């Protein structure tokens, strides 16, 4: 892609009054296959502003990554097809942009850290070339300027001897170091929005903590927004401002991190919270799994998609799709009984204990 000198960088444009940096409104992405229609993303909505972190949580196949890939314009169509909704960045619809416009958006305005850095990095090119590629495309840097900035970026993300490492290949880096390279690549053009698709899945807990801390440090320094995709609620516990819980392509609960952990209203969210390992070793409580398997996205029944696995499901749940119950703060959950105080007494004890202890500490 040649740098288009007539292209107006959207990052230089103010967010229209009354709008958000990123607005996803009832997004639906379906895949049309020989076996049927896969409803991979079915009605996702959220907003994101500068400096905010959104955690997107759910099991494999819940639509987390497909939502992100749709925003980035990386879904092949066909078989993919946007069946409804919109994605607006700084007031402009991404879905209506041409491919040339999207090439300017990717990496420059919205960047993505992919799940597996070993398959995301090109094994035949040196690290310095790959980190500096975006700078040459979007900023018009020369080869020497891009290499110099790539060296600075590797140093920024904590890779030792960056002057030497820019001339090495991906196979010469450990898993944690490769993930740092991916972060350096994503941050090269100082994007407005950084999408991190399970960036810590294959890493041990020590490196995992370092990567999360690094992302938070970069956010504090640059003020960018982060979308953190993960299957583990514990990963986003300390870094997310807002959390969206997805199941079978649909958002089942959305709220602030405090609301999700302390005031959750959906049984699937409760299951995710109960599956987080406890820190207190002396209690020796067994983990509580979510029984059953996620449904096929081609054969979703008419009722609540979680009802076959939900221990509280009723006939109403099995026959009627629940509407979102929204509180004044904007916290919503897609459950028939999320407004019932008696039903909410089934919420995890750990969640209520945390909430009670927090209140006690504030008193």
For each feature predicted by the language model, list its residue ranges.
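Charged, flexible cofactor/metal-binding loops and thiol motifs
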Residues: 14-18, 257-359
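ABC ATPase NBD Q-loop/coupling interface
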Residues: 32, 86-104, 142, 213, ...
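P-loop NTP-binding/switch modules centered on Walker-like glycine-rich loops
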Residues: 59, 195-199, 203-285
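Conserved ABC ATPase "signature" region
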Residues: 90-93, 144-164
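ABC ATPase NBD coupling module
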Residues: 94-111, 137, 259-264, 295-301
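A short, proline-enriched helix->beta-strand linker immediately N-terminal to the Walker B motif
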Residues: 188-192
């Amino acid at each position: 892609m040649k740098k288009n000198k007539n292209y107006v960088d959207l990052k230089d444009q103010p967010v229209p009054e009354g709008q958000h940096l990123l607005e996803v409104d009832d997004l639906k992405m379906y895949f049309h296959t020989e076996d049927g229609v896969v409803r991979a993303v079915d009605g996702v909505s959220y907003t994101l502003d500068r400096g905010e972190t959104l955690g997107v949580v759910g099991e494999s196949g819940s639509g987390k990554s497909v939502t992100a890939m749709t925003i980035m314009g990386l879904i092949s169509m066909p078989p993919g097809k946007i069946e409804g909704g919109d994605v607006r960045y700084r007031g402009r619809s991404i879905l209506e942009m041409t491919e040339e416009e999207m090439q300017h958006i990717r990496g420059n305005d919205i960047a993505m850290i992919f799940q597996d850095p070993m398959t995301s990095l090109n094994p035949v090119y040196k690290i310095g070339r790959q980190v500096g590629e975006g700078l040459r495309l979007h900023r018009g840097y020369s080869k020497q300027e891009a290499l110099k900035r790539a060296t600075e970026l590797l140093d920024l993300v904590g890779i030792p001897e960056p002057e030497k490492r820019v001339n090495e290949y991906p196979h010469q880096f450990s898993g944690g170091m490769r993930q740092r390279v991916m972060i350096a690549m994503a941050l090269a053009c100082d994007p407005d929005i950084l999408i991190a698709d399970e960036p810590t899945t294959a890493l041990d807990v020590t490196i995992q903590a370092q990567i999360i801390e690094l992302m938070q440090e970069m956010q504090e320094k640059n003020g960018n927004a982060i979308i953190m995709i993960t299957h583990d609620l514990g990963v986003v516990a300390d870094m997310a401002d807002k959390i969206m819980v997805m199941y079978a392509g649909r958002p089942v609960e959305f709220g602030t991190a405090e609301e999700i952990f302390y005031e959750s209203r959906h049984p699937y969210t409760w299951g995710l919270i109960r599956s987080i390992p406890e820190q207190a070793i002396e209690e020796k409580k067994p983990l509580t799994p979510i029984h059953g398997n996620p449904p096929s996205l081609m054969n979703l029944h008419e009722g609540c998609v979680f009802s076959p696995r939900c221990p509280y499901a009723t006939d109403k749940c099995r026959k009627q799709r629940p509407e979102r119950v929204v509180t004044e703060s904007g916290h919503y959950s897609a459950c028939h009984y999320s407004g019932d105080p008696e039903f909410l007494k089934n919420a995890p004890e750990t969640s209520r204990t945390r909430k009670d202890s927090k209140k006690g500490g504030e008193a």
